[in-house]
Amino acid sequence: MPARLDARATRRYFDSAFNSPAVKILPNEYYVTNGEDVMLSTVLGSCVAACIHDPVIGVGGMNHFMLPEGDIHSPASATMRYGAFAMEVLINELLKAGAVRERLEAKVFGGGAVLSAMQLMNIGERNGQFVLNYLKTEGIPVRAQDLGDVHARRINYFPRDGRVMVRKMAPHHQKAEALIAQREAAAAQTVQAETRAAPRVERFARPGGMPV
């Protein structure tokens, strides 16, 4: 996969508060573990993060997308900024790592109406509804959710056991608002720009009889 269009997160650090190695997930990125004991962390405004894992083997991953779906005829739709593509990439990578589709469980977060521009476009609500509908269609149960509201959120996810720690940031928190405004404004500008064609993702097989 092209690093810029559907990027696997690479920013590693040690989180002293949780005494754990960690990977920072930025907008339009994802990360899937392969049995490693690591925390995945991201900050969300109107964006949504899906945390999905296989509880039997302790493999899990997180994505971070900005918009639900793009024009299916546009090459820009096949990028991690769009939920439809980001969810497909995440699930595909989990299956490649040994997860069993019937055992997958999800927790979803974000979709806040944090910035006035995003409120007008209803982006957060659309993202939240999209991820719930997507998981329902694919038969993946949602074990926990924290969507909507006016708060930015910091998400710390432990894929090995599925734990998630959510910290809501107070409205008008200057540092949080500046960070989110910068990231989401940049992402919004990127969405408007033309992007080169991305390779198609091979769709995962859906077993017969799965609930939709």
UniProtKB/Swiss-Prot annotation:
One of its GO terms (biological process) is chemotaxis. It comes from Bordetella parapertussis (strain 12822 / ATCC BAA-587 / NCTC 13253). Belongs to the CheD family. It holds the Pfam family CheD. Probably deamidates glutamine residues to glutamate on methyl-accepting chemotaxis receptors (MCPs), playing an important role in chemotaxis. Signal peptide: none annotated. This is Probable chemoreceptor glutamine deamidase CheD. GO terms for molecular function: protein-glutamine glutaminase activity. Keywords: Chemotaxis, Hydrolase. Its EC number is 3.5.1.44. Coiled coil: none annotated. The keyword Hydrolase applies. PANTHER family: CHEMORECEPTOR GLUTAMINE DEAMIDASE CHED-RELATED. It catalyses: L-glutaminyl-[protein] + H2O = L-glutamyl-[protein] + NH4(+). InterPro entries: CheD-like_sf, Chemorcpt_Glu_NH3ase_CheD, Cytotoxic_necrot_fac-like_cat. It is an enzyme of class 3 (hydrolase).
